[in-house]
UniProtKB/Swiss-Prot annotation:
This is GTP cyclohydrolase 1. It comes from Haemophilus influenzae (strain ATCC 51907 / DSM 11121 / KW20 / Rd). The gene is folE. The keyword Nucleotide-binding applies. It is an enzyme of class 3 (hydrolase). Toroid-shaped homodecamer, composed of two pentamers of five dimers. CDD domains: GTP_cyclohydro1. Zn(2+) binds at C109, H112, C180.
Length: 218
């Protein structure tokens, strides 16, 4: 694994300690070698499906898939890509809830490698530190860019924000459509899945939790 920041290392260790890290191994090959190997195998998979890779629309698809896997939709498996964090001392003594709603979520179901599409809401009560609002979106995106199950993703986000912000007072709410349900199997186009995770005051105080949910469920 490439060199990673202290924040990334702390988050990774916290996930491992809680048993909620994505099951993955440190690759032994360089990225270029991995892209070449994936493209070679995808070429064979597509032939087995019955596609003619001599067609100019298909011939570069194995390479496109390899690049997409390594550099894009699974880039969150490499903690070297963890967002750079600039924590700001809470000198203004902000004590009200900070909440970001409707963060775009696009991830990949680890069971069938099809899309998970939804929204994420994150809230926290600052203690000693705050972070830029865009960093919240970037952290969500990082953990979405790996094969996922929604339940684990929700817990990973909770732990990541608790670790970075150095507070237990964090809430995460995820609402998503799973294309493994929508595009195959039962082919249900209407259902969605909701998961949530709470820490600190959000877990202990019902009124605080209700205040958070009142905005995300509008």
């Amino acid at each position: 694994m490439s060199k990673i920041s202290l924040d990334a290392l702390n988050v990774r260790n916290a996930l491992i300690e809680k048993g909620i890290e994505t099951p993955m191994i440190d690759p032994t090959q360089a990225k270029n070698e991995r892209r070449e190997s994936i493209a070679k195998h995808m070429h064979e998979v597509m032939k087995l499906i019955g596609l003619d890779l001599r067609d100019d629309s298909l011939e570069e698809t194995p390479n496109r898939l390899a690049k997409m896997f390594i550099d894009e939709i699974f880039s969150g498996m490499d903690y070297a890509n963890f967002p750079k964090m600039t924590k700001i001392k809470n000198q203004m003594k902000v004590s009200e809830m900070v909440q970001v709603n409707d963060i775009t979520l696009t991830s990949t179901c680890e069971h069938h490698f099809v899309t998970i599409d939804g929204k994420v809401c994150v809230a926290y009560y600052p203690k000693d530190w705050v972070i830029g609002l865009s960093k919240i979106n970037r952290i969500v995106s990082f953990f979405a860019q790996r094969p996922q199950v929604q339940e684990r993703l929700t817990e990973q986000l909770l732990t990541a924000f608790q670790t970075i912000l150095e507070t237990d007072d964090v809430a995460v709410y995820v609402k998503a459509t799973h294309f493994c349900v929508k595009a195959r199997g039962i082919r249900d186009t209407n259902s969605y899945t909701v998961t949530s995770a709470y820490g600190g005051v959000f877990l202990e105080d019902r009124d605080t939790r209700k205040e958070f949910l009142a905005t995300v469920q509008k």
